[in-house]
């Protein structure tokens, strides 16, 4: 014990002073089974006991010292987890104990969850140190489930849905890939995955046509398929059944508004057209003769760049029945729904050549065509039907560049031709086809809806890139054959609006048939009438670039003479010697200048329906435009003029809602026979009431807030600035209306606006905040009465302004003099106020100076007394002896204070040393008690072990 105490004392003596109460360690040994007995010292060494690996017991012998990094954990296991040591260090000084023989643990332990009380036996401190190892082997037998699909019998209905059989790579049995189902009337399934089947060696039926059910909602979104060439055989009966099944689908894209947005014009072949030959209404909208291998996805058709193709339609044989309606419906047709995707499609440059070789055209043939979808009839039709067999050829023009690049190209060299007529894009085309059997067809666009007709004309006016060329032979109209060659070329630039790029012009052959003699006489008289319209616009036609020429048709002169009385007409003077006097460039600039002047005249007169374009009187009325011309040459328009006209048309379209409303009104009036009267009345009222409406609107906006206190009218003062060309004849001068005293005859009883608002505008119920109805009536009557009174006063002032004009200058001078006097008085008062402020400041400064002088005077009177006090203060207060005495007293006092402080420090040091000694004594006593407690615990443990041995002996016995 003495050696251990000395050792601890040497350890506790450290160089730095530490608080011993803080470094005391809790050396109490836990009595629970989870804690082990160990003791930690202040050095980096651990004391452990030797462990007998063979016997599994701890040897009570001299401990072994290990380093700190190889210490044991709190549960007794080392870091290497190879041994289990007991950290009990009691009995170091006792005699070594011989190792015990290994005794097997005979007790049983239930590890089940139900008998949870047995769990505590794991931590029983009385049990033996033998380690019990439990090994649990769980043997699980897994069942291997192998699933595969066997062959489905051929005739069952489940063969259509056997999709899993396609992916069965283990079973090499033959899989039924038939999509028919084996039953009559069943729908065919689009077995797309059969293409990728590696196990199927049989040919796959790729016919994906589905018979349209009665109520098929999703059928709207399906694209119609084209049968393969192997199935298109007219001799086979099965092929005809498949064709009839494929044609059972509704291919009319105009009947469904939703399909019009998703279907492409190039989705049907000529075979599908042949199946509808027994139908009277042959709606061939969007049908293009395309091979099956060239058919692409309908969705990608929206993004394709259109190709310029030339489609030639030749009538070879057969007769057209009277009830055949070859209608190609597009945007221009008011009966058809709107094609949503049509505005995003780029129109193709196509050339249609219609040559009539034989046969007769019946009276009721309606061939309405739009340029959105080109008609291509069927090439093969059976003879047992009365349909027309037409030959369809499609050629691609060589050398045709992109439509978009045509905008940026330089204009070609212009070549002047003796052509006469001028054709504008905004004009309505009326063409006459003269037949040898004295039958005249008038081709006119006459929609049923007048409002839609006016909007269609507006869209026609926005077409800026269309060139119309008419080729007509010089033969006599009576001896010419029934052959008309018409070429139509579209050249729409990509820089225009989508609406303008969609060509909505519709050309019809009406049902009214006229005689050839009447048509010839009308055309001959048309050149002699003053309504003859002709103008020359020339440009060079480049082969392969400009394409073919446009169509211009001659209109019926009777319709011109009838419409000229009820609507404005285009009068264009022909320049016969244009080719000799001016070149192509000057001629083009002249036409551009005329079009610009037309736009300026429209903007100045605010009449978009009436445009004057030339000194001779070029007048265009988009609501009803007619053209009469006898074509004898080729006319074309250069690209520059088209671009200039496009800019002009875009500027004219800025007021399209207003013009469309006017045209709608005029169209409605024209049905009742009052178009000319309504137009004349509109123009007259607009010219007369242009400024009157402005003044009325200003007076009505003032309302009940207008009173006598309101002076000049700002809007009336700015009348000359707002419209210098149209000054009101009744508007008085603002100065006169201000200076002239009001006449008692037109005096209005003054009122207070606040009182009126309180009396008449107070709601009956403050919670509901609903005003009295009489308040609104009073406000309306008051505003109307006051506006009338002001008008009468202004009229009277204007009538007597001549008499007052002589005294006006004098009154103005008096007013100016009075204003000058008021200004002078204001300046005088301002000057007086500033002078008063300056004088007050000077007075304050003088008073402060006077106070300072008074104080100085008082100080000068007490000067002698002050000098005596200064002298006394300047004299020394202490002598040398007194100063030394005071210094000595100071030093003595300081020494006494230092001595007292030193004595206090010594007493405190002695007290501190006493406390330290007492603390050391207490620490030693505590250590002794701890050692005694440890010995007692060791003895108690040994007694418990003896008791356990006795109990085991009893149990063994």
Curated annotation (Swiss-Prot):
Annotated Sequence repeat ranges: 87-90, 109-112, 206-209, 251-254, 282-285, 326-329, 367-370, 390-393
Positions of region (8 X 4 AA repeats of M-[D/E]-[I/L/M]-[S/T]): 87-393
Primary localization class, coarse: cytoplasm
Name of this protein: Outer kinetochore KNL1 complex subunit knl-1
Polar residues composition bias: residue spans: 91-106
Free-text comment about domains: The N-terminus contains a number of repeats which contribute additively to bub-1 recruitment to unattached kinetochores. The repeats are not required for localization to kinetochores.
Function: Acts as a component of the outer kinetochore KNL1 complex that serves as a docking point for spindle assembly checkpoint components and mediates microtubule-kinetochore interactions. Kinetochores, consisting of a centromere-associated inner segment and a microtubule-contacting outer segment, play a crucial role in chromosome segregation by mediating the physical connection between centromeric DNA and spindle microtubules.
Residue ranges, annotated region (Disordered): 89-111, 476-504
């Amino acid at each position: 014990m003495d050696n251990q105490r000395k050792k601890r004392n040497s350890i506790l003596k450290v160089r730095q002073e530490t608080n011993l109460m803080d470094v005391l360690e809790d050396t109490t040994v836990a009595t629970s089974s989870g804690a082990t007995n160990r003791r930690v010292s202040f050095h980096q060494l651990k004391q452990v006991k030797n462990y007998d690996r063979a016997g599994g017991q701890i040897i009570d012998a001299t401990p072994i010292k290990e380093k700190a990094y190889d210490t044991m954990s709190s549960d007794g296991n080392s870091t290497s987890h190879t041994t289990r040591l007991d950290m009990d260090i009691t009995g170091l000084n006792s005699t070594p104990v011989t190792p015990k023989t290994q005794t097997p643990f005979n007790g049983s332990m239930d590890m089940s969850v139900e008998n949870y009380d047995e769990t505590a036996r794991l931590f029983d401190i009385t049990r033996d140190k033998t380690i019990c190892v439990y090994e649990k082997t769980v043997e699980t037998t897994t069942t291997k489930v192998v699933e595969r699909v066997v062959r489905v019998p051929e005739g069952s209905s489940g063969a259509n849905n056997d999709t899993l059989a396609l992916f069965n790579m283990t079973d090499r049995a033959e899989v039924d890939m038939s999509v028919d189902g084996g039953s009559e009337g069943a729908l065919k399934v689009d077995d797309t995955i059969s293409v990728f089947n590696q196990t199927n060696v049989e040919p796959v039926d790729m016919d994906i046509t589905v018979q349209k059910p009665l109520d098929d909602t999703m059928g709207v979104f399906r694209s119609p398929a084209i049968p393969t060439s192997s199935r298109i055989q007219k001799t086979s009966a099965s092929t005809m059944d498949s064709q009839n099944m494929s044609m059972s689908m509704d291919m009319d894209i105009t009947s469904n508004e939703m399909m019009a947005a998703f279907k492409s014009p190039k989705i049907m072949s000529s075979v599908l057209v042949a199946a509808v030959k027994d139908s009277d209404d042959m709606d061939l909208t969007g049908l293009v003769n395309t091979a099956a291998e060239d058919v692409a996805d309908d969705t990608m058709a929206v993004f394709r760049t259109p190709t310029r193709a030339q489609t030639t339609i030749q009538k070879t044989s057969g007769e057209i029945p009277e009830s055949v309606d070859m209608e190609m419906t597009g945007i221009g047709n008011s009966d058809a729904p709107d094609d949503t995707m049509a505005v995003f499609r780029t129109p193709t440059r196509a050339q249609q050549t219609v040559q009539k070789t034989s046969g007769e055209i019946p009276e009721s043939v309606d061939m309405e065509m739009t340029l959105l979808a080109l008609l291509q009839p069927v090439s093969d039709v059976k003879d047992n039907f009365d349909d027309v067999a037409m030959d369809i050829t499609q050629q691609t023009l060589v050398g045709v560049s992109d439509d978009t690049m045509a905008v940026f190209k330089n204009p070609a060299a212009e070549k002047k031709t003796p052509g006469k007529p001028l054709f504008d894009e905004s004009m309505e085309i009326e063409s006459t086809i003269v037949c040898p059997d004295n039958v005249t067809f008038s081709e006119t666009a006459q929609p049923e809806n007048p409002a839609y007709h006016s909007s269609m004309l507006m869209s026609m006016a926005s077409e800026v890139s269309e060139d119309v060329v008419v080729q007509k032979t010089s033969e006599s109209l009576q001896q010419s054959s029934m052959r008309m060659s018409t070429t139509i070329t579209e050249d729409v630039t990509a820089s225009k609006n989508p609406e303008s790029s969609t060509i909505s012009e519709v050309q019809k052959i009406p049902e009214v048939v006229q005689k050839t003699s009447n048509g010839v006489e009308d055309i001959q008289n048309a050149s002699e009438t003053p309504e003859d319209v002709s103008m020359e616009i020339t440009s060079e036609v480049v082969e392969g670039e400009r394409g073919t020429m446009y169509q211009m048709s001659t209109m019926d002169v009777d319709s011109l003479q009838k419409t000229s009385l009820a609507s404005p007409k285009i009068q264009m003077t022909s320049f016969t010697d244009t080719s000799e006097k001016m070149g192509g460039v000057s001629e083009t600039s002249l036409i551009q200048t005329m079009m610009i002047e037309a736009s300026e005249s429209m903007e100045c007169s605010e009449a978009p329906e009436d445009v004057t374009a030339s000194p001779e009187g070029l007048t265009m009325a988009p609501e009803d435009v007619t053209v009469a011309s006898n074509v004898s040459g080729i006319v074309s328009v250069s690209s520059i003029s088209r671009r200039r006209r496009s800019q002009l048309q875009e500027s004219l379209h800025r007021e399209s809602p207003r013009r469309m409303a006017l045209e709608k009104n005029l169209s409605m009036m024209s049905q009742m026979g009052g178009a000319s009267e309504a137009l004349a009345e509109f123009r007259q009222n607009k010219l007369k009431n242009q400024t009157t409406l402005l003044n009325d609107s200003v007076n009505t906006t003032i309302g009940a807030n207008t009173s006598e206190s309101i002076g000049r009218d700002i809007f009336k003062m700015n009348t000359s600035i707002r419209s210098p060309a149209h000054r009101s004849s009744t508007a008085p001068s603002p100065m006169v209306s201000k200076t002239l005293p009001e006449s008692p005859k037109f005096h209005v009883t003054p009122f207070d606006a606040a009182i009126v608002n309180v009396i008449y505008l107070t709601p009956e119920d403050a919670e509901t905040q609903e005003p009295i109805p009489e308040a609104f009536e009073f406000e309306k009557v008051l505003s109307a009465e006051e506006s009338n009174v002001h008008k009468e006063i202004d009229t009277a002032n204007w009538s007597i302004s001549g008499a007052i004009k002589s005294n006006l200058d004098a009154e103005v001078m008096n007013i100016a003099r009075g204003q000058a006097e008021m200004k002078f008085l204001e300046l005088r008062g301002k000057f007086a106020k500033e002078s008063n402020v300056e004088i007050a400041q000077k007075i304050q400064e003088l008073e402060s100076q006077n106070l300072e002088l008074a104080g100085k005077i008082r100080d000068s009177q007490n000067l002698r007394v002050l000098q005596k006090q200064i002298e006394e203060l300047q004299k020394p207060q202490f002598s040398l002896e007194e100063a030394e005495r005071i210094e000595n007293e100071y030093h003595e006092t300081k020494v006494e204070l230092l001595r007292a402080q030193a004595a206090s420090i010594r007493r405190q040091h002695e007290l501190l040393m006493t406390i330290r000694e007492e603390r050391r004594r207490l620490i030693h006593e505590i250590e002794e008690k701890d050692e005694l407690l440890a010995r007692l615990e060791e003895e108690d443990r040994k007694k418990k072990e003896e008791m356990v041995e006795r109990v085991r002996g009893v149990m063994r016995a």
